[in-house]
A protein has these predicted regions:
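N-terminal propeptides/leader regions of secreted preproproteins
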Residues: 12-107
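Transmembrane helix interruption/hinge and helix-loop junction motifs
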Residues: 127-132
Length: 178
């Protein structure tokens, strides 16, 4: 597993002050206020856009390089179903929760390398839409604790999705420095 994939998967869920529901298909909250503010703004920006329009916005508004955006989209497009990840209950019941934790991961000290690591990790998660992935990447990348060792946790709840299908839905996400 690449260091980039491991980094993004190392976000750990912690207590959250608020929750944000969005049309991008994901409801998350961060313990870090800066990340939460960036997520709220990015989710508004990406709502209703095509994947191509989101890619353009990531480059022109959020300062990602074209190669970072290409990497994000290719990893997102090739991601596995959440049910293929080890650790998730094999026979869950409705309402059951699972905290997927990866880490500890030491972030690179330079911003670009850390951003690429987060892109790989978050894009590989079973997040319901490219817009939601892009919003998460944008929110986290702007507030990375460079050079720190972190644990990332994503809490999932099993139940009916917005499409009326039973599945795991990502919820609270947090980055904890260890």
């Amino acid at each position: 597993m690449s260091a980039l994939l491991v980094l993004s998967m190392s976000v750990n869920s912690v207590a959250y002050a608020s929750s944000v529901s969005s049309p991008t298909g994901i409801e998350v909250s961060f313990s870090n206020a800066g990340i939460q503010e960036n997520l709220d703004a990015a989710m508004q920006d990406f709502t209703g856009l095509s994947d191509k329009e989101i890619c353009d916005l990531l480059v022109h508004k959020y300062g990602f390089s074209q190669s970072e955006v290409d990497l994000l989209y290719s990893v997102y497009s090739a991601r596995a179903s959440i049910s293929t990840y080890s650790g998730f209950p094999s026979n869950p019941s409705i309402g059951q929760t699972y905290g997927w934790e990866v880490g500890p991961i030491t972030l690179p000290t330079e911003q670009d390398a850390a951003r690429i690591a987060v892109i790989n990790a978050v894009a590989a998660l079973a997040v319901p839409s490219f817009g939601a992935v892009a919003a998460l990447i944008t929110a986290i990348a702007a507030n990375l604790p460079l050079g720190e060792t972190v644990v990332i946790t994503i809490n999932y709840t099993y139940g009916y999705t917005n499409d009326g299908v039973l599945g795991w839905t990502p919820g609270y996400i947090g980055i904890r420095i260890v």
